[in-house]
Amino acid sequence: MKDIAIIGTGFSAASFSYFIKKDLDFYEKSRGVGGRCSTRRVDNVGLFDHGLQYIKSQDEEFKKFLKDYCVWKGDFKIFQNNRLIDDLGKERIIHENGNNALVKNLFKNKNVMLNKELKNLEKKGDNFQLTFKDDTQENYKTVIITAPFQQAYNLTKQFTESFFSKFDYSMQPNLTLMVAFNKSLNLNLSAISFEDDDVLGFAANENTKKKDLINKDLELWTIQSSLKYSIKNIYEYRNNKPNLIDEMLKSFSTKLKVDIKKDNIHYSDIHGWLYAYSTNSDT
């Protein structure tokens, strides 16, 4: 009988592994570790941090936990009331090889099973039987689920429904546009946060993060949508990518007063996160 299974391989799972000095088995439904700390690699283009943009932390214990990181330097702005103002006083932690490396490094020498999506969790006496999407099964004394709330609830509601019913907890979506230009926008900015905007939430110039891993002839931007825009479009975004890309780029170019022509777009794609971040006050 195995001891402890951890479902998910994001920061929560990595943190648990750091503090619990035991042999643990990790199961990840994707082809790699990281969770929302995700980096898109595009051949002959470069890297997009299309999940976590940066970590804001002054905690020395947390930095010790990370071990391998760097600080994102540059000019950061907030777009508010139709103007750009300085966004000061933050130390933004990133990884120069893509933010996925922040988590990936923490799982070195760990027992990780990839492409293993948990389908069902059943109590068998004093133990739990895990059934995966590939119909394989494993048994453990303890199972810890670090997946987003709704996914964790769906897997455990037969045991925990009365507990979860106490909380008003929800997770919100996000749409993330990745675009590479063959001509610089000449903004000379590292990132912009958009306050109370109908379409945009955040934009990062990837060239200011990982200069050595990006095609020198291209300028890469990751542009995240506002919550309002995400809620409106998350369920149909796969069928509407060209229109959403056009709308987000139009909003971006209008607000920042840059001219973006279609023939200047070398690469573009949009990714939807159904469970991007939490909004709750009870837990």
Predicted regions, residues:
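Core beta-strand elements of the Rossmann-like FAD/NAD(P) dinucleotide-binding domain
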Residues: K2, K133-T142
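Glycine-rich FAD pyrophosphate-binding loop
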Residues: A5-F11, Y18-D43
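N-terminal FAD cofactor-binding segment of flavoenzymes
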Residues: F19, S38-F79
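Conserved flavin/dinucleotide-binding core of flavoenzymes
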Residues: G32, L218-T283
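Central helical "cap/lid" subdomain
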Residues: G34, K141-S190, I260
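Short beta-strand to alpha-helix junction loop
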Residues: Y54-E60, L84-N105, E236-L244
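A conserved short coil-to-beta-strand element within the FAD-binding core of flavoproteins
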Residues: L114-Q129
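A conserved mid-domain beta-alpha-beta active-site/ligand-binding segment of alpha/beta enzyme cores
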Residues: D198-V199, A204-T208, I214-L227
